[in-house]
Amino acid sequence: LFHAPATQQAKIIMHVTPLSGISTEALDALLDDAFGRDRHLRTAYLLRKGMVAIDHLSFGILDNDICVVSIQCWPVRVQHADLILVGPVAVATDRQNSGLGKQLMHLMLDATTPQDPPMVMIGDPEYYGRFGFSSAGTGGWTLPGPWEPRRLLLRNSAMAELPAQGTLGPAD
């Protein structure tokens, strides 16, 4: 449970739940708020097309049954190497800079197991570097849509051997 500061009207209690426990409508409303209605045109959507989110690594934070923060993780691959695509990490616009996104990132990372493959994401290295993500090791990778190479980030804490080149895409 997360406890937000009490307001004059009511105390707000937020709780973390697996993403599978959040309605599609509530999640879509959050994603539209955080990224816009045209979010489906982004390259990250091509990477996870047809995939099902990884349940033990995908969460949301509910505030009075409204999803205000979510993180999703997806199975992807570069050549024959399995990876976990992290994202989207969505925070409602009225909750930006609240620390909830950071808390959910830590929760997701804590939920990883030694058997989980390395993680990749498209994001700001200045922000996600604090979680161990960097563009090191992704310079020879391509994506099925536009992207900025400096924003293709890898977290390979187990130092798994990964291909130097290849196209990132959905796991089969």
Language-model regions: role of each:
Residues G60, I66-R77, D82-A90:
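Conserved beta-strand in the GNAT
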Residues T113-E148:
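Conserved active-site alpha-helix within GNAT-family acetyltransferase domains
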